[in-house]
Amino acid sequence: MNTFIIFITSFISVIILDVIWLGIIIKPFNIKMLAPWMTEDFKLWPAVIVYILLALGTTFFVFPQISSLGTAILYGALLGLIIYGVYDMTNMAIITGWPLKFALVDITWGMVSGGLIAIMAYYISKFLK
């Protein structure tokens, strides 16, 4: 039961963070950096799959490692670094003109969001005990 609650908490946290980050804070930067590749038609289903995958990563790779708030932040940030790093470095390798500046900001965001989601998982797990 705790695993399911951690998954749902992570899933909701990812959505909230991404809506704030992508929809408000970083939107002008993303438009400037990614204009050649952006679509005008937002597709919900791929976003939902991404949020499910990120929540699964937190649930099964970060949550079992959490023994303190510090380890939550460390493992969450590390997962964010790996996921966003693979995405951005793959894009830099295969997409002509993929901006390094965007990649660095995106990877940093992956680490921050991963850490924040892990913090939520940590506090929820403490609440459930």
Please state what every model-predicted region is.
Residues 1-129:
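Juxtamembrane/disordered regions of integral membrane proteins
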